[in-house]
């Protein structure tokens, strides 16, 4: 088994294949695992294994996603591939599979198609930081001028959506040829992975980012003070460090962490991913509640107005049966709590149908800790009717 070779000391990067239906995303995913498996860096996964993507639930939305993992000489990758277009839209908009970079697959036989455009736009909206292009099926195109034309079209489309179209790596190859071990095409898969290694930056580790913990619960411990519990979202907290407490009218609430509790033991520090209780000096239990966040001083501000990119569940997915209109007021579930907000639709849009994805403006009734990229679910009477993420802070 190749699994034993996985070297966890390599930096980890999340990638995914995007692009138009039938342009070869899944075949390329299979080809990458095959070429790397032949070097002992992955487990080979065949097309049908990847294509039969298991259903996953993310914030109440069912998404079909395939996850494969592989390594190159320098990195370890988790790679997502989705069978259907709707799955991509849901995946990218809800951030179910966070991508540090994307491999855009475009068939040389077709050139960019409607979903190519839509996936590039989505990648722009949800902030996929980097991309590499694989021009697939070039073995089926005899005319080199046609290949140049398709490359030009791809570059123009990328530039139109504010990606570096002029400089982005475009590798011309054949996923099927690579999968069938034809040396000429295997080389193009290797070239692609070199580009992915070089062009997609390693994301900053969660522990290197400024400390933030959403509050889940608050207790009062006699003689010790107030303890707020939650899962540390990012960063590191050490006993003795100062923090800000933000959201729901917590104005300039500051404190010092006098202890970090984990599994009933008092520790000196907690880091991203830990479920902890933070002992807070000089804070009344009444002044802090679920949904607030505790963070590194000055790192996050409370906001009440933002733009978001959302996916609205279809009726079949358990969403609304009817469209919603301007000034619709659902709850936005952010981190650990619901906040009511009013939705403003883009000019010229009268209503939003179940199954749509759209950019909206939201005014929340309370200011909470918000930042670009924060994900949320949209709920109505406790059931999820949509999901999305913050794309811009307005106020």
UniProtKB/Swiss-Prot annotation:
GO terms for cellular component: cytosol. Mg(2+) binds at residue 26. GTP binds at residues 19-26, 81-85, 136-139. GO terms for molecular function: GTP binding; GTPase activity; translation elongation factor activity. InterPro entries: EF-Tu_GTP-bd, EF-Tu_GTPase, EFTu-like_2, EFTU_2, G_TR_CS, P-loop_NTPase, Small_GTP-bd, T_Tr_GTP-bd_dom. Residues 136-139 are annotated as: G4. It catalyses: GTP + H2O = GDP + phosphate + H(+). The keyword Electron transport does not apply. Residues 174-176 are annotated as: G5. Residues 19-26 are annotated as: G1. Residues 10-205 form the tr-type G domain. It holds the Pfam family GTP_EFTU_D3. Residues 81-84 are annotated as: G3. Its EC number is 3.6.5.3. It is an enzyme of class 3 (hydrolase). It comes from the Bacteria. It is found in: Cytoplasm. Residues 60-64 are annotated as: G2. The keyword NADP does not apply. Keywords: Cytoplasm, Elongation factor, GTP-binding, Hydrolase, Magnesium, Metal-binding, Nucleotide-binding, Protein biosynthesis. Monomer. Belongs to the TRAFAC class translation factor GTPase superfamily. Classic translation factor GTPase family. EF-Tu/EF-1A subfamily. NCBIfam families: EF-Tu, PRK00049.1, PRK12735.1, PRK12736.1, small_GTP. GTP hydrolase that promotes the GTP-dependent binding of aminoacyl-tRNA to the A-site of ribosomes during protein biosynthesis. This is Elongation factor Tu. It comes from Cytophaga hutchinsonii (strain ATCC 33406 / DSM 1761 / CIP 103989 / NBRC 15051 / NCIMB 9469 / D465).
